[in-house]
Amino acid sequence: MNYTIDTVVAISTPPGRGGIGIIRISGKSVPEIAPKLLGKIPNPRKAEYLPFLDTDGSILERVIALFFPEPNSFTGENILEIHGHGGQIILDILLERILKTSSDIRIAHPGEFTKRAFLNNKIDLVQAEAIADIIDATSYQAAKSASNSLQGIFSRKIYIILEQLTNLRMYAESSIDFSEDEISIIPYEDIKKKLRNIISDVQKMYKSTYHGVLLREGIKIVIAGKPNAGKSSLFNALVGIDRAIISTISGTTRDTLHEYIQLNGIAFHITDTAGLQKKSDNEIEQIGMKRTWEELSNADHILWVIDPNDVTNKENDITLKHVEKVLFCKNKKTPITIIHNKSDLTKNQIGISIINNYTIITLSALFNDGTDLLQEYLSNNIKSKIQQDCKSNLSENQGNFIARRRHLNALEKSSKYLFSAQTQLLSTMSINELFAEDLGLAHKELSKIFGKFTPDDLLKRIFSTFCIGK
């Protein structure tokens, strides 16, 4: 079904000079517009070299034209693509000429071509988002994973869960309808088993989706520890520039600093923080420590930096245990790696060891000695974790997929309703309306991933982040 009545046009290539410039037109008026511009309607799905005509019939440009009749096109509508020279002036001239050919043609909004593809059921909302994620990818792994999402890997896994949930809802509703007749549509134990399997699948999918979010947004690494432990030196060494001021004076860093790096195709967001201590009478230091706690609460991985002079100091252990306690209370199991810094002073051997279930890396941040070991450890650790958590959900040849926070929220809400349904089922030992209602709410939350039951303002916000011409 075609949801649009007007025709839209936009330059699809980036602004500026280039070898080729592309203009895309989509809508019902394309067959009417094409002869005015090209003297004919190009043969479907075949590249044709044609003159691009002005209003008086003179040739403005010679172009390659491609015509895709509805419904077999990206948007599901008639599409005409004009491939000409890549100068901005000539593209603007061609665009102005196109806008004069019909009264119902207008400039496309950002992401409108992709939105039309979604509205015309050519792609689902996850695939639409994957298109934007491919364009915006900041690492090789993110681009590859976004491509997997575009191919439908993520969508297929969710659709399977939705199908299972639909069948369970059908059994539940039927059992309720025939309860007065004492007709058992499906045994109670079978219902319980099916629900348990769905909950398990949703939880596995949540893990995989979480790592899909990390691949899209980047892994948040927070560097923390006591004042003057060498946190800023480590930050500078990891990001490759002297971004943070370093000094022997305790408490030099008062605010958080953020930088982005790539390690083996994975995006990392490195954050330097103010030092943590038991107490401080300095108001600025107090604000800095408050921000450090905020960063730690949102970290995907923590690097806890220790000054060699404080290794035997119990305050380091007390502060670290306090960090772990706070994170535990917030239901966060953030991995922590301990960094024994300043090996240039202690002459300790650079390397990796495991002590009391902590991974400990000895290095010299100031002299950038051993930081390559840390970088390799971080990238390998993240890759291993992603592969391990996704292994039960995806076959080896499928690979990872990209995901967004809203997908996580939908899975989390759906899981809560499923657990509520399970509680209802086990407590009453029967299939009732409350059980069926929880299943319906879980189904609705999962369906939001694909744009069903999704508010128009959210759809508008999603597509507004796209490029014009996409």
UniProtKB/Swiss-Prot annotation:
Entry cofactors: K(+)
PROSITE patterns attached to this UniProt entry: G_TRME (PS51709)
CDD domains in the cross-refs: trmE (cd04164), TrmE_N (cd14858)
Main location: cytoplasm
Localisation: Cytoplasm
Binding site for K(+): N228, S247, I249, T252
Cofactor notes: Binds 1 potassium ion per subunit.
One GO BP annotation of this record: tRNA wobble uridine modification
Quaternary assembly: Homodimer. Heterotetramer of two MnmE and two MnmG subunits.
UniProt protein name: tRNA modification GTPase MnmE
Classification lineage: Bacteria, Pseudomonadati, Pseudomonadota, Gammaproteobacteria, Enterobacterales
Gene of this entry: mnmE
